[in-house]
């Protein structure tokens, strides 16, 4: 139970980076926070998959749910990075605009999600996933 709580706290800390301003021109004027990610139903489904994977006792299946969930969240963060400006500023895909108006907090969010995935992979490699048991 302690491990599951610790894994949940690590995941919530990683998700808390969505509260930061990811995109925008001038600070405080045109900021778009990472909560824009929650407008994407795939990202919400990936968050739910990760939480289900943490709190179930299915060994390999739990690992796969967490892995798919965290990878999906990272992919949706990159998708938002590439497309956030289409509806708000430019009206078309522009990679240069994505890089120019991206705040460092976005990169912090992506790196924290990668770190979370690496922590989970390290933990699951240390245990025997062939057993369907509680991993606490």
Segments (PLM) and residue ranges:
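Compact integral membrane and secretory-pathway proteins
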Residues: 1-136
